[in-house]
Amino acid sequence: MTTIDLSVKRRLQESVDEDKGKLIDLLSRLIRIPSDNPPGSTVEIAHFIKDYLEGWGFEPRLYEPNKGNVNVVASWGEGSPHLILNGHLDQFPAEVGEKWSVPPYSGEVKNGFVWGRGSGDMKGGLSSLIHCFCATSKQGLPGKLTLTCTSDEETGGRWGALWLLDNVPGITGDSVLSGEPSGGTVRIGEKGMIAFTVKTRGKPAHGSFAGYAGENAIMKMGRLLPEIEALRNITASLTPEEKVLTEELMKGYTAQFGHEAEGLAGVLTHVTVNIGIIRGGVKANIVPAECEVEVDMRVPIGVSPSQLKATLTERLRGIDLSASVDYSRHPSTILGATYSPPNSIITNVTRDNAKLVTGIEPFLSFTSGGTDCRFWRERGVPAVAYGPKVYAMGAADERVPVEDLASTAKVHMGMIVDFLTKKSK
């Protein structure tokens, strides 16, 4: 990196403190636009971001491949290197009856935090990406920077990141920076996801004849549930390199979750199975004709979705031939665990800048949740997440520390400069 590059980087990082009020205001304004998923409409927030970017002189493009699922794309520069900034617009809903200290869509700034639904997941990181995208555009940096604001990350990404990659030229890039909350770590990967519904069928009859007439679909389901739960016992097959990587990632997990990490550690290396919803029957005195359960399964490194799906089908058919399985999300959004090389350029510039800004060497980490990054990784593009700490994510009093929001923006500024200048040489 030249002296000029260092000067640009230092100036941009110092500007975060000068413009902290603008950064906080942008986050508050994003929070005040509900983008709950469900129902999933990002129309209003997408148009707000479009107007904001136009105020900086950009010509952002809106894409609405499915009604209400609006995505925003903007770019500056040209050629290579090409860095993609990625954040999602949708968020978990604020549930009726949640006990908030402030109105959930207020974006209130209080006690050193910006409060509100979506502040952490992920409007805090998104506001930093937007702010840095705009600020770095005026510095004469080489290469190209593209901002992607996607519509449906919370429900699988079919109409957001996946659709953009499949249909819009210039979205792939050389590497990806996501602003997802990462708890001070550099998140290089994530577990895979499989969501499915199992249904059993019986024969209705009057409840007074139970055991003598009809077939109870709920009882059939009861025999299947242990087999579904037992999928968590499938063991991962790891290469020596994957074993070393997993050990490193466990350190990052501890850094993220502190004292809770010991009890949660197995999440990274095992299949998890959550039987989250069960429905069956219409009345207590009628033998139920149908029963269904909705299941969320997360897949670690070393286990493939196809392996799990085949095992599930085999086990269910062995007990009840009438049982059916429906995979809730579009097949193209069901992927195994994905991760980026620990020594990729984007990983290294993230670690370097996080240490520069915070004074702490960040661990690499993995998430048990799902992000848009997986779609780029599946295409061989390194993708990492670095975003502000979040308290009570997805719950009452979700909030982001103001100082962490600012330090995240400084890291993002440095990453953009370093990636575009280092990769261009």
Where are these regions (language model features)?
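Short beta-strand segments
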Residues: 86-87, 148-150, 177-180, 199-201, ...
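Acidic/histidine-rich catalytic neighborhood of metal-dependent amide-processing enzymes
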Residues: 122-195, 265, 424
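Acidic-glycine-rich active-site phosphate/pyrophosphate-binding loop
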Residues: 94-109, 188-200, 352, 384
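Metal-dependent amide/peptide-bond hydrolase catalytic core
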Residues: 1-7, 35, 66, 195-425
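Generic structural signal for helix capping and beta-alpha/helix-loop junctions
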Residues: 70, 155-157, 185, 372, ...
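Structural motif
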Residues: 81-84, 113, 146, 174-176, ...
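Acidic/His- and Gly-rich active-site-bordering loop/insert found
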Residues: 2-115, 138-142
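Predominant activation on well-ordered alpha-helical scaffold segments within soluble catalytic domains
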Residues: 28, 50, 127-130, 134, ...
